[in-house]
């Protein structure tokens, strides 16, 4: 369990208060397989009523990177998605074009990335509240924009990274992540941030079994490979 202060994330022990739901993926009320992405307009709310959505058998191509057209849901700026289960048959889970809100969104088996956030600007905030993700061989949350991502009371199991600030986007910037009340089991780092671009991370009441829940990278721009350069400590 850790907390931190921003700028250079410094982790210190705190009282246990991890609130990620540990009862598994909820039982779906219905199942919808769609041939095309579902778009949620700017500022609108899509309440799935605990139905499961996917893109049909064979949609997942492993770690082959897709785009928003391969996602199950595409949220325009300010949109909200809630009470939904994203099934295993998908290449991309949820794409946000600008800041968005996800409330109780569950991913039963992540393919490439569960959540991709892009085109958010400095000062704008994305909220991921409740929900969780299983079997993400790489990232759960991929942050390509320049705002702040808040991850609250989330549950992750069998994952590579819960959050990653883009390591090699063509245009780089400072990004911020705040993680609170989250449980992360059988995985790697909770957050990976780019030290050289001034990223900040705050972890509060996070329960993780990773030896290094917060990792520093040297990010780069374009066709390059970011390098791991250290760990947050305190």
Curated annotation (Swiss-Prot):
Function, as annotated: Pectinolytic enzyme consist of four classes of enzymes: pectin lyase, polygalacturonase, pectin methylesterase and rhamnogalacturonase. Among pectinolytic enzymes, pectin lyase is the most important in depolymerization of pectin, since it cleaves internal glycosidic bonds of highly methylated pectins. Favors pectate, the anion, over pectin, the methyl ester.
Main location per the UniProt record: secreted
Recorded GO CC terms: extracellular region
InterPro entries recorded: Pectate_lyase_PlyH/PlyE-like, Pectin_lyas_fold, Pectin_lyase_fold/virulence
Lineage: Eukaryota, Fungi, Dikarya, Ascomycota, Pezizomycotina
GO molecular function per UniProt: pectate lyase activity
GO biological process, alphabetically ordered: cell wall organization; pectin catabolic process
Keywords: Calcium, Carbohydrate metabolism, Cell wall biogenesis/degradation, Lyase, Polysaccharide degradation, Secreted, Signal
Gene: plyF
Top EC category: lyase
Catalyzed reaction equations: Eliminative cleavage of (1->4)-alpha-D-galacturonan to give oligosaccharides with 4-deoxy-alpha-D-galact-4-enuronosyl groups at their non-reducing ends
Coiled-coil blocks: none
Protein name: Probable pectate lyase F
Co-factor binding comment: Binds 1 Ca(2+) ion per subunit.
EC number: 4.2.2.2
SUPFAM superfamilies registered for this protein in UniProt: Pectin lyase-like
Organism encoding this protein: Aspergillus fumigatus (strain CBS 144.89 / FGSC A1163 / CEA10)
Cofactor(s) needed: Ca(2+)
Family recorded in the similarity comment: Belongs to the polysaccharide lyase 3 family.
Subcellular location per the Swiss-Prot or TrEMBL entry: Secreted
Signal peptide: 1-17
